[in-house]
Amino acid sequence: MVYRTHNLGELRLKNIGEVVTLSGWVDTKRNVSTNLTFIDLRDREGKTQIVFNNELLSEKVLEEVQKLKSESVIRVIGEVKERSNKNPNIPTGEIEVFAKEIEILNACDTLPFQISGVDDNLSENMRLTYRYLDIRRNKMLNNLKMRHRMIMSIRNYMDNAGFLDVDTPVLTKSTPEGARDFLVPSRTNPGTFYALPQSPQLFKQLLMIGGVEKYFQIAKCFRDEDLRADRQPEFTQLDIEMSFVEKEDVMNEIEGLAKYVFKNVTGEEANYIFQRMPYAEAMDRFGSDKPDLRFGVELKDLSDIINNSSFNAFSSTVQNGGLVKAVVAPNANEKFSRKVISEYEEYVKTYFGAKGLAYIKLTADGIASPIAKFLSEEEMKAIIEKTEAKTGDVIFIVADKKKVVHSALGALRLRIGKDLELINKDDFKFLWVVDFPMFDYDEEEQRYKAEHHPFTSIKAEDLDKFLAGQTEDIRTNTYDLVLNGSEIGGGSIRIFNPQIQSMVFDRLGLSQEEAKAKFGFFLDAFKYGAPPHGGLAFGIDRWLMVMLKEESIRDVIPFPKTNKGQCLMTEAPNTVDEKQLEELFIKSTYEK
């Protein structure tokens, strides 16, 4: 049996008179008269109008037509004819197929939701539960096509640039890199566990020691962490590593790749400028290490103005080593009611630990602010000058520890940009954020952690300070690629000196015994001639999400998890039989 001679986006005027066989899903069915029934037949490539003329068809065919429901799968044989009522909105809109035979290959039951058209009331949970139906919808199917095009573009570019596509293990050793590992018990080695890789980081560095020189991989990675709109417990990563390179070599290669992928996915020439900004500047100006440059609204430091103020809530913060910073919401005076401002205050307090959110409204009648009575006329004037605020603007101020101020105002800046529609959604702004600090002090755990990861090399200008025992303000040879406020890639030049690598582990609180237990195989490899090397990893899902202007990463992944890490379609994760646990020498301590 021939199921089809053409796909449903293929037929044109040149095919008139041909007898064709078509198969697909019934998109819509219209009884336009007692004698005529129209069906839009759909497959991955498009739609074709099928005409059933009752006067020309057998009773058997008519019976089949009457039974048809939307989304039933059918096979049709018919003749291509010119369409009298042409549809310029689809490629096949100049023709139609007059059916001679029809076969229902698979009838469709009552659908849980409408496939064709737009259903604004369709919940994401419903879409994820019936993901195989959701994929039939134009938006999801197009996103998967774009995903394919993106990955093929990556493979073509990397191959032409001399990179080798090398697989690395999925069952590996637990060496936590920040997030929790997903653990897999070993039945054949009782009491031991594999870990699913958070990234191929160690293996790709070992490949450089092995002489591969230029490596890439489209890798599955796994992180057991709290989820957001742009995160998943399992995700796809473009992993890249190169030997005998400096930072500029890697960044130039990545810029070429990004432009090539953009052109192939969007069809547009990607003559984008890749700006560069040190981490310290990004945090100071935008309160974020991944600033969205599509709009202004920068943070302004008021600490020097407030330092000796009689307003103790501000001045004491500065005197105790904190910061007082502000952002300006332009022309927001009439738009931001007290209710909106209260919501903003609750936002920065709840999610970022800020003690509060002060505000100053510049109205046509003067200054309106609960804190105006605590500030001198000179201080208020200096704040307005420093923030460059104008009549109609609203100044928001946070006084707190440095981290709190930056995270709170950085997030508030984004919210202001969205609420005031300051962001050009058709624009793409690339930014390299470079020179991240090596260490970040975790106040809760009372220890230093790696800001990027512990395999990042230290900038030559700061190496002597590090070797002399300094831990604060040690910068690294790092480079994160940010697109429209989303980090789509992160990389660095790596440490390739075993002594320095051991010193980094020591600063992170790992004893020699712990370092040997976790990374002994890795440190041993460095003894046998490790070349200078560096690389980068792209988050495929997040990069595609930004390119396609989607709000959620789940809209570019075929079968994603929810924010709770669940697959609503398969109902994973699920409980398992006690027998399975016994075979793995595991006993659950969880009590419902």
From Swiss-Prot:
ATP binds at R223, D224, E225, Q232, E487, G539, I540, D541, R542. It is found in: Cytoplasm. One of its GO terms (molecular function) is ATP binding. It is an enzyme of class 6 (ligase). Its EC number is 6.1.1.12. L-aspartate binds at E177, R223, H452, R494. Keywords: Aminoacyl-tRNA synthetase, ATP-binding, Cytoplasm, Ligase, Nucleotide-binding, Protein biosynthesis. The keyword Nucleotide-binding applies. Its main location: cytoplasm. It catalyses: tRNA(Asp) + L-aspartate + ATP = L-aspartyl-tRNA(Asp) + AMP + diphosphate. GO terms for cellular component: cytoplasm. Residues 201-204 are annotated as: Aspartate. PROSITE patterns: AA_TRNA_LIGASE_II. One of its GO terms (biological process) is aspartyl-tRNA aminoacylation. HAMAP family: Asp_tRNA_synth_type1. NCBIfam families: aspS_bact, PRK00476.1. Catalyzes the attachment of L-aspartate to tRNA(Asp) in a two-step reaction: L-aspartate is first activated by ATP to form Asp-AMP and then transferred to the acceptor end of tRNA(Asp). Belongs to the class-II aminoacyl-tRNA synthetase family. Type 1 subfamily. Homodimer. This is Aspartate--tRNA ligase. The gene is aspS.
